[in-house]
Amino acid sequence: MHKSKFLVGLAVILIASMVLASCAPASAPATQAPAEPTAKPAQPAAEPAEATEAPAEATEAPVEPIVLAIEHFSVIEGTTWSGAQDRAGKRLAEKYPNVTYIFRENVAPDQSVPFAEDMIANEGANIVVGNAEFMGMPLKDIADKYPDVNFVSIVASDVSSKENFIRTFPRQYQALYLEGLIAGALTETGNIGIVSAYPNVQVIRRTAGFYLGVQDAAELLGKDVKVHVKYAGDWYLPQEERDIAATLVDQYQVDVITQQTDSGSPLDVATEKGIWFVGKDMDIVGEYGWSTTDTVAVSFDTRWEVLYDQIIQAMMAGEKPEQIIYLGMESSMQLADGTDELTVDIMNDGKLGVDAISPKALPLIPQEIVDLVKQRREQMMAGEWDPFTEHAFVSNGTGLDMEGNPVPAAGTEVKTAGEEPTVEWLLSQFNFDLQGMNILE
C-alpha cells in the first residue's frame, strides 16, 4: 500500500518535471553573441556545434586599423619612382578594408620627421615610409619614441635597422636581366647606352643585372656588344640627361638606350633619333602613355605594394615584420581585383612576360632569346635561378670607393659563379662595375 502511493507520487513528480522542462528556454542560446541581437534562433540539440561556435565570435578582437603613410621625396604625378610608390599605397588600401593610405610629397630630409610626427599624431599613421634613403634615414631617430609605429626606409647602401625601423628594396636586377637579354638581341650596331645618375650601390647593382643579360644574349648569338655608361651627376637633370643620350647615339653609335635617371629626356632622344628605348620602374607606355611600343622595346614594373604587404600582414597577425625585406620575382600578392602580381616583372603596354616585348621589336629578336627570356622568368618566379648567383662577378676596376671597401682592381674575381651573394653584400657593399663595361668620363 505504501509502496503503491510512493510509485504514484514519483510518477507525478517525473511528469511535472518533464512539463516544466519543455516550457523552459534552452540554456545554450543565452551565451550566443550578445552583440548580435538579430542572430538566428538556437539550433536543435541535435546540432550542438553551432551553439559552441558563437562565444568565440563574441570574443574575437576587431581588426586594428592600419594607416600607411608614405613620404615621397618628389612629386607623384608624372614620375615612375614616386608614382609606383603612390600606386602601391592605393592598391593596399583597396585590398584591405582596415588600411588607409595617406602621403606627403616633395619631402626633404629635414621635413621627414616633422611630417611623420604630424601624421602619427593627427591621422593615426602606424606605418611611415620614407621612399628614398636620404630622406628616410632620419626616421630611424624617432623609432624608439614611437615603439608601436613601424618606420620604413628604402635602401640605397645603408642597411642599418631596428625592430621598428625596417629597410626594404625590390630585386629589380632580376627584371633588368631580362631587359638586358632583349636589348642585347635588338642592337644591330653592337652598342647599348645607359644614361645614369651617379656611382652608388643601387645604380651599380641594377646596371649589373642589365649588363649580365646583355652579355648572355651576346654570347648566345655570337655577337660583340658593348655597354656604354655616362653619369649625369644626379637623378633628375633633364638637360644633362638629354645631352648624354645624344652623345651616346651620335658618338658611340648606340641604337638601344636605357637609363638609371628619372627624367623623360633619354626617352625623348630615343624617339627623335629613331632608336630603341628600354624603360625602368614602371610600364611607361601602359601606365602613363609617354610613348608607344614603336620606341619602347620593353620596360619593367615595380610593385612596392608586395614589399609593404609583408609589413601589413605581420601587423595584422600581431607579429614583428622582418627588419630587411628584399623580395624578387619569387614573391607576389593578390590585388583587390584578384590579379596576382610579382614584386617586379617586365611589362609593356599592360602586357607581361614575353608578351611585353614590343610587337615591332619581336620579329627582330631570335627565337632562342625569346625562349630564354621566358625560361629565365619562370625560373626566377619559382626561385630556382638568379643571375647574381649564376654568374661570376669580375671587377672592371671602376665604381665607388667606400670607407673600408675600395673598388677591387680590374680583373679581380670578387664572387665565383654559382655562389649566392648575401643580402647585406648586395644592398650595401656591391661597389664596382662588372668587367667589360665602358664607363665614360
Please tell me what each predicted stretch does.
Residues 26-28, 40-441:
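A residue-level marker of the well-folded mature domains of exported/periplasmic proteins
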Residues 21-32:
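Bacterial lipoprotein signal-peptidase II cleavage site
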Residues 1, 36-40:
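General helical secondary-structure elements
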Residues 1-10:
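Bacterial N-terminal signal peptides that target proteins for export
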